[in-house]
Amino acid sequence: MLPYPQIDPVAVAIGPLQIHWYGLMYLVGIGGAWLLASRRLNKFDPTWTKEKLSDLIFWLAMGVIVGGRLGYVLFYDLSAYIANPLLIFEVWKGGMAFHGGFVGVMIAAWWFGKRNGKSFFQLMDFVAPLVPIGLGAGRIGNFINAELWGKPTDVPWAMVFPPFSDPAQLARHPSQLYQFALEGVALFIILNLYARKPRPTMAVSGMFALFYGIFRFVVEFVRVPDAQLGYLAWGWVTMGQILSLPMIIAGLFLIWLAYKRDPAASKAAA
């Protein structure tokens, strides 16, 4: 068993002002996305300025934050927010959902592309390889917060999370680190290697949806579901799996459609 590193969730405290590691992870994700995007900008569109890129990243970040919060409200704890709608604004207490953030990013990309002469999938193909930076950083934030841990296990790398998080004090899968490794590191490598060569429009977006969906679906088997939801079917299906399955199907369809529309790219890939 590995010891859980005791890290104060509050990174900096200045009087009543507290800056949490989880919030800083959002800044890491946004900043990392901007740096990588700026390196790829000339290949994407030589006419785009760094200012336009900054505008894009800003609106995508808004999509992540607003969509992530609304997604959590709708998918994971709707009854609590109906009973007390003001809870929606208490973001410092946690409650963000990737799938909601993903929808927010898609809406922001569609809106920004329409205003700047880019199609939805042109922008999504450009953005997709940037997303794992934020995903990985977010999972590290979850780990520091000692939240979203996994099921009890006797694997050698199991961890016992702090009593405030897990009163049962059981050795558990550090599922946040699994998601960091898969959704952050592995997905980053896959997408950025794949996007190095010219690909037909929609293909990179399809690869993102496919592999994120697979990685999330698999990790859900060892991650404890949200207490207010539990398992939704057959004693093992979680909300995360239900929301990830359409991503897998959509990813496969987008990849197939992308190469069907561009036979030359299909032959080159073969």
UniProtKB/Swiss-Prot annotation:
GO function terms (MF aspect): phosphatidylglycerol-prolipoprotein diacylglyceryl transferase activity
Keyword Calcium recorded: no
Positions bound to a 1,2-diacyl-sn-glycero-3-phospho-(1'-sn-glycerol): 139
Compartments it resides in: Cell inner membrane
Transmembrane spans: 10-30, 56-76, 92-112, 120-140, 175-195, 202-222, 237-257
Membrane-topology descriptor: Multi-pass membrane protein
Pathway where this protein functions: Protein modification; lipoprotein biosynthesis (diacylglyceryl transfer)
Keyword Phosphoprotein: no
Similarity comment text for this entry: Belongs to the Lgt family.
Name listed for the protein in its UniProt record: Phosphatidylglycerol--prolipoprotein diacylglyceryl transferase
Gene that this sequence comes from: lgt
